Amino acid sequence: MLNDIVDVLADPADLTPLRGADDFTRLVSESGHSYDVAKQGYVTLAAGKGIGHEGDSLEMVNSRETFLSNGHFAPFVESVSDALADVVERVAGDADPVILEAGAGTGYYLAHTLDLIQGARGVGLDVSVPAAKHLAKSHPRVGAVVADVWEQLPIRTGSIHALAVVFAPRNPVEFARVLVEGGEAVMLVADQGHLDELREPLGILGVEDGKIERLIAQSEGHLVPAADPELIEYPMQLGRDAIAAQVGMSPSARHLDADVLQARLAELPEQMEVTARAQLIRMRKA
């Protein structure tokens, strides 16, 4: 809940500390700004003109919840959680570890990580309000924040022990700012071959070439590689409903007409093997 993580939150306008007020119905900063806490338990922390990017729709969030809850990405979840646990063990010491997930979605990965790391607190940040509603109730030790990863993060400098980014936007400058000394960003990035069996028959978006190289180049001066990239690849057995949920939670959902997608799904086998393939990238604060 927000009261568990308010000590690491900051005013998005000027990064001054936030505290709860009026029985935690709002958060206020030392500079006098106030941010209402939604009845669902999340808070929107955005300065100026507010959130500038479109987040996942309710339909996309529901598809994500359906797909992930059936365990199709379990090896990805385990790998991310294990890496975060390794970071926390190394850098947290006697402090209560704080884990931030940027682009946390429904909180599926973050909740699993908090189950693994006893006593850790989680800050889930996402630009989508429908996602934040799920995120706020994903785990007792998660605080949900609606904020834009591309902007200055509403997080106090040097307050985060480990940071997760799973198939989500990355902001190396801000990640480095919020991490403690020695802290790491653990990033799961789709690799060439991910969902390849679905791309031609469904017309979904492909994985761009050189994503890993660009990530490392963009991080120069802020984050440095902490380990060699780890390839995670395995086959999934997916029925049509699971495939529909996978496409529905992805960026392709914004580009494909629903009727066209349904027609293409109907032409697929009732069950098919689909490749899951991603790289786990660990980068330490420079």
Regions found by a protein language model. Give the residues of each.
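Conserved class I S-adenosyl-L-methionine
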Residues: E184-R214
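Conserved Class I S-adenosyl-L-methionine
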Residues: V6, E230-A286
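N-terminal auxiliary segments of SAM/dcSAM-dependent transferases
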Residues: M1-E54
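Class I SAM-dependent methyltransferase Rossmann-like catalytic core
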Residues: G50-S79, A83
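A short acidic, Gly/Pro-enriched loop at the edge of an enzyme's catalytic core
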Residues: W150-A162
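Short alpha-helix
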Residues: E208-H222, Q246, S250-D259
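Class I SAM-dependent methyltransferase SAM/SAH-binding core
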Residues: V98-E101, G105-Q152
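A short glycine-rich, Lys/Arg-flanked "PGG" loop and its adjoining helix->strand segment in the class I
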Residues: P172-V186
